[in-house]
Structure formats: C-alpha cells, structure tokens
Amino acid sequence: MEIKLFNKWDTTEIVVKDPSLRHYINLEPIFVPHTSGRNSGRMFEKAKMNIVERLVNNLMRAEQNTGQKQVTLSIVEEAFEIIEKRTNENPVKVLVEALENGGPREETTRISYGGIAFLQSVDVSPSRRLDTALRNIAIGTLNSAHKNKKSAAQCLADEIMFASKADMQRSFAVRKKEEKERVAQSAR
C-alpha cells in the first residue's frame, strides 16, 4: 500500500533543488502530518518533522487558531486542493519551491566593537532559512486572511503559489526575503 499525504498526494517523487535545504526538508511519506510533539525539545529534531506539519504548526500562530491543529490541518488540505486545481501540479512540490524562494540567504547581525555597534552581513544557516520561510508564509497568510472575504485556505494557497513563482509584488515571504537581503547587502 502506498502512503500519501492526506491520502491524496505522493511525496516520494519530489526533489529539493537547493542542496543546502535538502537535509532539512523532510518529505517522508505520512498519512496525516501530526507527530504529537515527538520531535520537540531536542536540538535539530525539527529537521525530522514532515515539512507540511511544520507549516501547520506555524499557522497555529494567531490567537483564534492556537492549539486547533485539526482546524489548521483542514485549512492546509483545502489550500493544497486549491493549488492542485489551479496549477495541475503536486501541491507539496509547489510548497517546496515556495520555501526555496522564500528563505533569505544572508542577514545582518549586530556587532559591538569598542563601544560602537554596527551591523555586519552574515550567511544564514539552512535551518534558519527554512524556519524564516515557513514563518513568513504563515504570517503572510494570516495577515491577508484577516478581515477579508477570502478564506484562510485561499490566502494560504495564494501565498504558496506566489512564493513558488518568486513574485515579489504579491508574496509576503518573498518581499521579506528581499528586504533582509537588501539590508544585508548594504551592511557589507
């Protein structure tokens, strides 16, 4: 028997193009992305968690969604159906492309030297890059769904599709990535 995500989408054929993110994007076959916090509390264990579950956990950020994992799972499943209908592609593949395009490659850190503080450009680790991309996709979804006629699933589908195309005008995640990289470039 073949294991598919939500019993609909196969994740075994998806290839992560970015070599740095390959070890952190987990696409192991799973029916329902819910591990009950099995991988929490230990360093780097989140890399073993399915990428869709990490997206669901990030979407449970808003006040009204806190702790409601089943509601958030249904939002993600509906968003994946919308993505599949619009693009005729595997929605998990589109999500992986969105994460590759939505994570910043360099950031700034504050360095204090002799009582003077200044910003220094640094490379971003793949784990932080993935965390930032997931966080920005979730925040962009929640911001666009707030006080809007569109459902959260439609807003999530739009955010993922625009981020996978690297559309800076319409994707919150790509816009934040470009902003961080621009600040880092000026701090070189």
From Swiss-Prot:
Family matches, as CDD domains: uS7_Eukaryote (cd14867)
MF (Gene Ontology): rRNA binding; structural constituent of ribosome
Gene3D superfamilies: Ribosomal protein S7 domain
Keywords tagged on the record: Ribonucleoprotein, Ribosomal protein, RNA-binding, rRNA-binding
GO annotation, biological process: translation
Record's keyword annotation contains Glycoprotein: no
Top-level taxon of the source organism: Archaea
Keyword Metal-binding: no
GO cellular component, one term: small ribosomal subunit
InterPro entries the UniProt entry points to: Ribosomal_uS7 (IPR000235), Ribosomal_uS7_arc (IPR026018), Ribosomal_uS7_dom (IPR023798), Ribosomal_uS7_dom_sf (IPR036823), Ribosomal_uS7_euk/arc (IPR005716)
A matching Pfam family: Ribosomal_S7
Task performed by this protein: One of the primary rRNA binding proteins, it binds directly to 16S rRNA where it nucleates assembly of the head domain of the 30S subunit. Is located at the subunit interface close to the decoding center.
Subunit structure: Part of the 30S ribosomal subunit.
Entry similarity comment: Belongs to the universal ribosomal protein uS7 family.
HAMAP family: Ribosomal_uS7_A
Protein name: Small ribosomal subunit protein uS7
Originating species: Methanococcus aeolicus (strain ATCC BAA-1280 / DSM 17508 / OCM 812 / Nankai-3)
Lineage: Archaea, Methanobacteriati, Methanobacteriota, Methanomada group, Methanococci
Gene: rps7
